């Protein structure tokens, strides 16, 4: 006969579990609590045809109106704040224990940054400017126009950071100064930078992201060019890629949260899917100012230029959060075939339907297909080869 409270065949004692009266354990979501406290408009989606047309609600401390965008993913690595500073307006000074990258959608203005009230720095920005605020530095944004609003997006790693510390007092009132990241250097926001191997460009301020110099990245396909951005010594990672008329990039996959913002192009789209049979595939048509967010883990996505000029996009993502080796740039497998253990589908391995969708969209835009050098069943012309040949 088995003794009560002892697991049969072992010497482990098993505590009796009450049949009733127990409650399910739940922990408060610090990020969701912050959103409610801010009373800010929230969008949960992964595709926005126009950042300029997103309807905003009041967000006075940011200088006017705003909204928070995030994907429907409980492992959300980042979010996106869409903010419009009213004409002549300014934000309230703030600092915080999460990283943030700004991209100016429209307008002009300035940002003042400081650790010490007596030693403030101010730099100016315009439409197309890209910059990062050093971790926990004080800053304030100003609209430089008295007649027009200034709109920007700010991609942050606030969701995981807030959920890690679960304390707003620490997140927004910690007085520690990360001087290894920013110590008041006069040239910090000068726009100067340094080029490293693997197309890595280190700079804290990019005055005009739609026209900055990019470098060849033939592994991602069809004459594409790219720069991997390292900014403000952040864990957050950004990059800019461009590809020629009548071409498309190879599909690849990675985790959720990469925000892709179209900087140039007159037509094109992204395909996004997770299932092997692509039964969940979405086609996201884009224009300048469209944003597509990678919504899921192991989510394939592929970008197509069906317009009549170059297509360039900016990708803003949370990065590795300190979990991987400290290499600059993108993931080591981003341009490696899945046949070799990477994340990328080579042109010869993609389903023919992908190219058919591309050629159909090209015809609608009156643009030629220029993928013959890469896709044998292409009905168009040779176009670029492996280099930057438009």
Language-model segments: residues:
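A short, N-terminal "cap"/entry segment at the start of jelly-roll beta-barrel domains
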Residues: 2-76, 167-239, 349-390
């Amino acid at each position: 006969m088995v003794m009560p409270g002892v697991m049969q065949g072992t010497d482990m004692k098993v505590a009796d579990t009450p049949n009733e009266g127990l409650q399910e354990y739940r922990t408060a979501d610090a990020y969701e609590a912050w959103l409610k406290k801010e009373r800010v408009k929230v969008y949960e989606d992964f595709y926005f045809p126009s950042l300029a047309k997103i309807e905003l609600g009041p967000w006075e401390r940011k200088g006017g109106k705003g909204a928070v965008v995030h994907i429907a993913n409980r492992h959300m690595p980042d979010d996106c704040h869409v903010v419009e500073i009213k004409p002549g307006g300014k934000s309230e000074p703030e600092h915080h224990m999460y990283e943030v990258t700004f991209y100016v959608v429209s307008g002009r203005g300035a940002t003042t940054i400081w650790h010490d009230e007596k030693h403030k720095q101010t730099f100016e920005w315009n439409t197309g400017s890209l910059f990062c605020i050093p971790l926990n530095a004080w800053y304030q944004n100003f609209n430089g126009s008295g007649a027009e609003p200034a709109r920007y997006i700010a991609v942050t790693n606030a969701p995981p950071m807030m959920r890690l510390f679960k304390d707003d007092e620490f997140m927004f009132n910690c007085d520690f100064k990360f001087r290894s990241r920013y110590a008041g250097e006069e040239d910090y926001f000068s726009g100067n930078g340094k080029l490293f191997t693997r197309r890595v460009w280190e700079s804290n301020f990019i005055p005009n992201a739609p026209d900055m110099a990019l470098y060849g990245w033939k592994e991602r396909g069809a004459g594409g060019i790219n720069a991997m951005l390292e900014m403000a010594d952040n864990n957050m990672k950004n990059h800019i890629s461009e590809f020629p008329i009548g071409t498309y990039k190879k599909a690849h996959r990675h985790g959720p949260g990469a925000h892709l913002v179209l900087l140039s192009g007159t037509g094109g789209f992204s395909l996004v899917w997770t299932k092997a049979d692509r039964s969940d595939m979405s086609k996201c048509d884009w224009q300048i100012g469209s944003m597509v967010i990678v919504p899921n883990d192991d989510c394939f996505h592929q970008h197509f230029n069906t317009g009549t000029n170059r297509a360039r996009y900016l990708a803003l993502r949370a990065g590795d959060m300190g979990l991987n080796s400290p290499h600059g740039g993108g993931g080591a497998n981003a341009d490696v075939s899945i046949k070799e253990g990477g994340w990328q589908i080579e042109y010869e391995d993609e389903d023919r339907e992908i190219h058919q969708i591309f050629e159909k969209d090209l015809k609608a835009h009156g643009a030629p297909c220029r993928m013959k050098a890469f896709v044998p069943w292409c009905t168009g012309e040779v176009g670029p080869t492996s280099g930057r040949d438009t």
